[in-house]
């Protein structure tokens, strides 16, 4: 632990969470100018303050990451909240989404709502059609894309993601994420350690709170049976 205490275990369940892949000019410290605000706290407040200080007629630009990442609908829920605020407070403003993929979670529902409520305020650009980010300057808020430069008044840059530091420090990672046995959630790399939540590779399960909750229950159930020499159960099918 951080205080130096060592806790012995027979089985351990860990949820390392996520960390960010800094590249394309978005380096550690860039959050002071272009917050990702994808971990709640100071950056959330900063992004809110930047929006409040933005002029009417300004441009809010979000760079949405490629899959996989925490909470797939999250960026688009945020865009909806920003659009609501701008419509009622800075109605001449514009939102541009530079998406590093060609489709996103619940896309039809989001775009139907945006068209109904915000008309031309929101401009979503897929990676194939003008959204691909080549580089970014967080201080000047200039984003270079394969279709030219985009200049933001407020830049919300959400980097691509990887498993949290604990996972890397513990040898649980292959590539960016933690491979697991999907029947038990035991790590494929470290015996008797079970990885749940956003850090694990759990097939088609999204990196969501519901998924993490369900994974924890399955891991606990299987561990309880292993410890008393009972056979494993087949986990139920889950829907999110």
Regions found by a protein language model. Name each.
Residues 66-90, 178, 187-195, 204, ...:
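Active-site substrate-recognition segment that forms the wall
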Residues 59, 92-96, 192:
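Residues at the starts of beta-strands that form the adenosine-phosphate
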Residues 29-56, 150-214:
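FAD-site-proximal beta/loop scaffold in flavoenzymes
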Residues 23-25, 71-73, 107, 166-168, ...:
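Short glycine-/acidic-enriched loop or helix-start segments at secondary-structure transitions
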Residues 65, 100-102, 198:
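Cofactor-binding loop segments of dinucleotide-utilizing enzymes, especially the Rossmann-like FAD-
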Residues 1, 7, 84-176, 231-233:
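A Rossmann-like FAD-binding core segment of flavoenzymes
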Residues 1-70, 74-77, 84-88, 156:
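FAD-binding core/adjacent interface of flavoenzyme oxidoreductases
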Residues 199-239:
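A conserved FAD-binding loop/helix module that cradles the flavin
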């Amino acid at each position: 632990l951080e205080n130096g205490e060592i806790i012995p275990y027979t089985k351990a369940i860990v949820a390392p969470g996520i960390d960010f892949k800094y590249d394309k000019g978005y380096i550690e410290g860039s959050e002071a100018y272009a917050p990702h605000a994808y971990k709640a706290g100071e950056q959330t407040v900063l992004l809110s303050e930047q929006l409040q200080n933005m002029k009417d007629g300004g441009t809010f630009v979000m760079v949405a990451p490629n899959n996989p990442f925490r909470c797939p609908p999250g960026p688009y829920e945020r865009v909806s909240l920003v659009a609501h605020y701008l419509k009622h407070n800075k109605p001449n403003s514009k939102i541009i989404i530079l998406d590093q993929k060609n489709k996103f979670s619940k896309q039809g529902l989001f775009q139907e709502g945006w068209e109904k409520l915000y008309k031309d305020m929101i401009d979503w650009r897929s990676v194939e059609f003008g959204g691909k980010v080549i580089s970014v300057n967080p201080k000047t808020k200039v984003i270079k894309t394969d279709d030219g430069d985009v200049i933001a008044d407020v830049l919300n840059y959400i980097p691509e993601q990887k498993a949290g530091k604990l996972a890397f420090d513990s040898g649980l990672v292959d590539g960016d994420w933690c491979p697991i046995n999907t029947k038990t959630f035991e790590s494929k790399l470290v015996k008797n350690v079970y990885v749940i939540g956003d850090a694990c590779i759990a097939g088609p399960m999204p990196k969501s709170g519901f998924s993490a909750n369900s994974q924890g229950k399955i891991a606990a159930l299987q561990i309880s049976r292993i410890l008393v020499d009972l056979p494993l159960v087949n986990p139920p099918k889950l829907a999110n």
